Curated annotation (Swiss-Prot):
Residues 803-894 form the PKD domain. This is VPS10 domain-containing receptor SorCS1. The chain crosses the membrane at residues 1100-1120. GO terms for biological process: neuropeptide signaling pathway; post-Golgi vesicle-mediated transport. Disulfide bonds: none annotated. Residues 38-53 have a biased composition (Low complexity). BNR repeats lie at residues 208-219, 256-267, 492-503, 569-580, 611-622. It holds the Pfam family Sortilin-Vps10. Residues 111-123, 141-150 have a biased composition (Basic and acidic residues). Keywords: Glycoprotein, Membrane, Repeat, Signal, Transmembrane, Transmembrane helix. Belongs to the VPS10-related sortilin family. SORCS subfamily. Residues 1121-1168 are cytoplasmic. Glycans are attached at T68, N184, N352, N433, N765, N776, N816, N847, N908, N929.
Length: 1168
């Protein structure tokens, strides 16, 4: 499993990001390779992207501390493309901190003409297309048409209050990290560095500090040491006054710590080299440090002293405890690697992580790089049998396997979010390559239902998976996603967490006011939701919690998403309607809690203007922020709520120092807003006011008022709605059909949900619906659609299985093996369980409260042991057998065996292995009721069954320390009929060609035949054959009751066969695979099994009867030899491989027209 990302933006260029508050990082391209500018982000600070090719990925959570100075963003706020410099700014979730990455040294040298034009300021003041508006402003996004108007524009332009400060002496530095404390603080810290690409290290650094919001700066190199080279700047997320500086490990390994916002520092030596840090989300002095040699350290004194926790820790797989789920705030979750390369999940206290005090919450090994601890959930992955299996623990309870629809068969899974006690996951299924399906879970994170199919994905430069999904800030349950439909990518929106999706309505008019002829569903608005090619760069889509109705994004109008003809669009009513605001890409900042939008154009030329909108993007005014055009490297927005200050970072030329332009927006407001300056606005979806079960009314500033908002007040009022069907999604195992009903999927048995129930207890009997998590509706149909508690029925034991805890059939001599007794139905608490371990030891259990812990046993000798379990209660009994090898792994074994054969006929069983060459093998065969197995060195063996009925054959294959098994059931009768079935071609599109799918489809076909013909199910056996196209074999069996009486005659079989053929020829047999997918079942041709078999074991009377039939048949053949040609199937050659779907062993006795049943001898019908 790879890492997943979701966000917004264009991949056409590396972009800069302007965000709210916090930390800005400016660095040259290629620096990530050195690790000094772009360290690996820790998962707890990485929302939806990372680079590891395996294991779960996840999104960060509010309140999580950044592990490194690069916490990935929750939602991008502002982007700027500074030409050939790469820059991104991202905000750490829940900390109020923001970050950016930029490049300076990679700037190309412009031609002389370009340089001259840049230094004259041409291009920087070039206005967009359109007509000039009041005050000399132009319509945004359009170019000048009248030179006189352009001149008048420059003369009458509006100016913002700004000051410029140059970081003198740092002109060679190509990286910068900026921290703005905010929260009533005027302090800004800047760390600039010179990264030498040839040496791959930092050779110079400078530390600057401002105490007046960036008007002036003081150089602090003498306070940290003139020869000290600094590599990183860290800020405590819970106390912004605490600063930590990390020295370059190439020179020395030290920390410089400040508790007064960087005014003074204390230096501490380290005996290890820090690769990343993870701050505690609550305790400001608690830190985890990950070293370059994969050791994890902890400090309870903000880095002044360190203690080793664990060696061999997997990178980025360590986490702090989560309040509300863990009792101990100092508990550490980590994934550690053993000497032999396995991984396991450990927990321990930060200051007491000895061998005796470590816990292992998940028994056994997990897949490397798969541990995720996020909110109330813990996720791990375990691959067995070539398939990944995913496990979740909710609120630190026992792990349960995550349940996707049965035939999702995931290749890859990524945890996108765990907000509001629900898991949102992206799953790549067995038949997907560049798309993922979105699934949403119940509260425990166990049962998942489909939210959206075929969401577009792409792979980042470091191998991380990026999902085209964007969560809109400020509105619970609102997402945008790009879905692939017939090779076209279209943007969809949901307001109820994926229950319903719709296309985006395009604007009615363009920038010039001309009508846009775009009709749904053939034409719509499509938005770019990908992040930039730079893994630390956010994309060009923006929303903000404090402005819940405003969304700004780049995209296009048409039939599909395009990378050309990109414009900028804004919605001020939460995605219901959209307006075009620019014809070229811009980046937008939310100022004054979204009361003002600031836009800056993407251009490789120097600029000195930006655009402001005071009416949610309806109109824009042009302002200059500097008198000299500036190559913009990045922008840092206001960290506080009312400062209205923005800092622009850039250069006047490629030879100049860093220029810091402080822009103060307070002068554009004449007063603070009063109550009469606001109006109510109701959230809705195309007129529907009930969103997620509630009506929400927000307070918005009137568009004509130009006052400063200050603090955000949130929703004015919220009231719950009456529950309707729209507030409920289909429950696990159910699918929504065209009539809107949720009906069971073909593979799902609703009664299976009560199998773990004990008499006297109760379980939730699903109605097929479940309420959307976080939906606040009340009354209405809530009672009708909610699952009902139901008393557990008393049942006899059924479906008993005994397995080892790790699912293997081997155990080490002298070590504990845990046996799990699993009962599909039956009352565990009133059951007697008897276990015979096969080594002379047996135990009994009565009235067990739970079997979750399993039964432990130690085998003292090596060998194969027959473990038998007998379960009895007052209603019945059941038994199960496990053949346990006490010592061996093999990838896969499959038993090839006929579905049906004739009595006293030799049957060939073959073990098919994967991989086929695994060295010396031992085959252990169990069949019938034999208590002793047959052991061979060959993969094939012959059996003979002397009595009619169902028989079971089990093969176990041993190779070294690996043992795998497969079990098949074969029907044995003196006589039967068989018919080849075919299907409408659409079934092949959904055929993953695995045994489980074939068994379930066979069951569905049998059910359809029984319903269409009324033939009892005991007479019908359907076997779906492997391979494509999909085919099946229908067997008509002479069922008899358990007493051996009332056995069907040959004539009865003929009549049943004719009825089945007639029904199939009438196209009356069909089934619905999924909503909208109807599969028709056809008849191919029929063969028949003999009344007697041509073998010496039969009596003399039978031989006389056979000879008579032969003579009659010969006479008929002579008479009709020129009128009718009879084709007799031949037995296959010995080289025919079992598993070939066309293989059938048969000897025909009578020939009849294809439309009627043929009698003959069918020795065996083979399929895998």
């Amino acid at each position: 499993m790879g890492k997943v990302g979701a966000g917004g933006g264009s991949q056409a260029r590396l972009s800069a990001l302007l965000a709210g508050a916090g930390l800005l990082i400016l660095c040259a391209p290629g620096v990530c390779g050195g690790g000094s500018c772009c360290p690996s982000p820790h998962p707890s600070s990485a929302p939806r992207s990372a680079s590891t090719p395996r294991g779960f990925s996840h999104q960060g959570r509010p309140g999580r501390a950044p592990a490194t100075p690069l916490p990935l963003v929750v939602r991008p706020l502002f982007s700027v493309a500074p030409g050939d410099r790469a820059l991104s700014l991202e905000r750490a979730r829940g900390t109020g901190a923001s970050m950016a990455v930029a490049a300076r040294s990679g700037r190309r040298r412009r031609s002389g003409a370009d340089q001259e034009k840049a230094e004259r300021g041409e291009g920087a003041s070039r206005s967009p297309r359109g007509v000039l508006r009041d005050g000399g402003q132009q319509e945004p996004g359009t170019r000048e048409r009248d030179p006189d108007k352009a001149t008048r524009f420059r003369m009458e332009e509006l100016r913002l209050t700004s000051t410029t400060f140059a970081l003198t002496g740092d002109s060679a530095h190509n990286q910068a990290m900026v921290h703005w404390s905010g929260h009533n603080s005027s302090v800004i810290l800047i760390l600039t560095k010179l990264y030498d690409y040839n040496l791959g290290s930092i050779t110079e650094s400078s530390l600057w500090r401002s105490t007046d919001y960036g008007t002036t700066y003081e150089k602090l190199n003498d306070k940290v040491g003139l020869k000290t080279i600094l590599s990183y700047l860290y800020v405590c997320p819970t106390n912004k006054r605490k600063i930590m500086l990390l020295t370059d490990p190439e020179i020395e390994s030290s920390l410089l710590i400040s508790s007064d916002e960087g005014a003074t520092y204390q230096k501490y030596r380290l005996n290890f080299y820090i690769q990343s840090l993870l701050f505690h989300p609550k305790q400001e002095d608690w830190i985890l440090a990950y070293s370059q040699d994969q050791k994890l350290y902890s400090s309870a004194e903000f880095g002044r002293r360190w203690q080793l926790i664990q060696e061999g820790v997997v990178p980025n797989r360590f986490y702090w405890s989560v309040m509300g789920s863990n009792k101990e705030p100092d508990l550490v979750h980590l994934e550690a690697r053993t000497v032999d390369g396995h991984s396991h999940y450990l927990t321990c206290r930060m200051q007491n992580c000895t061998e005796a005090n470590r816990n292992q919450p998940f028994p056994g090994y997990i897949d490397p790089d798969s541990l995720i601890v996020q909110d109330h959930y813990v996720f791990v992955q375990l691959t067995s049998g070539g398939r990944p299996h995913y496990y979740v623990s909710y609120r630190r309870n026992a792990f349960a396997q995550m349940k996707l629809p049965k035939y999702a068969l995931p290749k890859d899974m990524h945890v996108i979010s765990t907000d509001e006690n629900q898991v949102f996951a992206a799953v790549q299924e067995w038949n997907q390559n560049d798309t993922y399906n979105l699934y949403i879970s119940d509260t425990r994170g166990v049962y998942f239902t489909l939210a959206l199919e075929n969401v577009q994905s792409s792979r980042g430069p470091e191998g991380n998976i990026m999902i085209d999904l964007y969560e809109v800030a400020g509105i619970k349950g609102m997402f945008l996603a790009n879905k692939k439909i017939d090779n076209q990518v279209k943007t969809f929106i949901t307001y109820n967490k994926g229950r319903d999706w719709r296309l985006l309505q395009a604007p009615d008019t363009d920038l010039r006011g001309d009508p846009v002829h775009c009709l749904l569903p053939y034409c719509s608005l499509h938005l770019h939701l990908k992040v930039s090619e730079n893994p630390y760069t956010s994309g060009i889509i923006a929303s903000k919690d404090t402005a819940p109705s405003i969304i700004v994004a780049s995209g296009n109008i048409g039939s599909e998403l395009s990378d050309t003809d990109i414009s900028m669009f804004v919605s001020s009513d939460a995605g219901n309607t959209w307006r075009q605001i620019f014809e070229e890409e811009h980046s937008v900042l939310y100022l004054d809690q979204g009361g003002v939008l600031v836009a800056m154009k993407h251009t490789s030329l120097p600029i000195r203007h930006l655009w402001l909108s005071f009416d949610e993007g309806r109109s824009w005014s042009k302002y200059s922020f500097t008198s000299i055009p500036l190559f913009v490297d990045g922008v840092l927005g206001e960290p506080g709520e009312e400062t209205l200050i923005m800092t622009v970072f850039g250069h006047f030329s490629h030879r100049s120092e860093w220029q810091l332009v402080k822009v103060d927006y307070k002068s554009i407001f004449d007063r603070r807003c009063a109550e009469e300056d606001y109006r109510p606005w109701q959230l809705h979806s195309q007129g529907e006011a009930c969103i997620m079960g509630a009506k929400r009314i927000y307070k918005k500033r009137k568009s004509e008022r130009k006052c400063m908002q200050g603090k955000y007040a949130g929703a004015m009022e919220s009231e719950p709605c009456v529950c309707t069907e729209a507030d409920f999604d289909c429950d696990y195992g159910y699918e929504r059909h065209s009539n809107g009903q949720c009906l069971p999927a073909f593979w799902f048995n609703p009664s299976s949900l009560s199998k773990d129930c004990s008499l006297g207890q109760s379980y939730l009997n699903s109605t097929g619906y479940r309420k959307v998590v976080s939906n606040n509706c009340t009354d209405g149909v809530r009672e009708q659609y909610t699952a009902k508690p139901q008393k557990c029925p008393g049942k006899a034991p059924r479906g008993l299985r005994i397995v080892t805890a790790d699912g293997k059939l081997t155990a080490e001599q002298g070590h504990n093996v845990t046996l799990m007794v699993q009962l599909e139905e039956g009352d565990v608490q009133r059951t007697l369980i008897q276990v015979d371990f096969g080594d002379g030891i047996a135990v009994s259990y009565v009235n067990l409260s739970s079997m979750e812990d399993g039964i432990k046993h130690v085998y003292q000798n090596v060998g194969i042991f027959r473990v038998t379990v007998q379960v009895d209660n007052s209603l019945g009994s059941d038994s199960a057998v496990l053949y346990l090898h006490v010592t061996c792994p093999l990838e896969h074994v499959h038993l090839s065996l006929p579905f049906v054969t004739t009595k006293n006929k030799e049957v060939n069983a073959t073990a098919v292995l994967w991989p086929s060459q695994v060295g010396t093998l031992t085959y252990v065969w169990w069949y019938g009721n034999n208590t002793e197995p047959l052991i061979t060195l060959e993969g094939s063996i012959s059996f003979r069954f002397t009595s009619e009925g169902m028989n079971t054959i089990t093969v176990q294959v041993s190779a070294g320390n690996a043992i795998l098994q497969d079990t098949k059931t074969i029907a044995v009768y003196e006589e039967f009929r068989s018919l080849r079935l075919s299907f409408s071609p659409n079934l092949d599109d959904y055929n993953p060609d695995i045994p489980e799918w074939r068994r379930d489809i066979g069951r569905v076909i049998k059910k359809s035949l029984v319903e269409a013909t009324g033939v009892p199910g005991q007479h019908i056996l359907v076997a779906v054959l492997p391979g494509l196209p999909t085919t099946a074999e229908l067997f008509v069996l002479p069922y008899q009751d358990p007493a051996g009486e009332n056995k069907r005659s040959t004539d009865d079989l003929e009549q049943i066969s004719e009825l089945l053929i007639h029904t199939l020829n009438q196209n009356s047999v069909h089934f619905e695979l999924k909503p909208g997918v109807r599969v028709l079942v056809h008849a191919a041709h029929l063969t028949a099994a003999p009344l007697v078999d041509l073998t010496p074991t039969h009596s003399g009377s039978a031989m006389l009867m056979l000879l008579s039939v032969v003579f009659v048949g010969l006479a008929v053949f002579v008479i009709y030899k020129f009128k009718r040609r009879v084709a007799l199937p031949s037995p296959p050659s010995p080289s025919t491989q079992p598993g070939d779907s066309s293989l059938r062993l048969q000897r025909a006795r009578h020939a009849t027209p294809p439309s009627t049943p043929k009698r003959g001898s069918a020795g065996a019908q083979y399929a895998i």
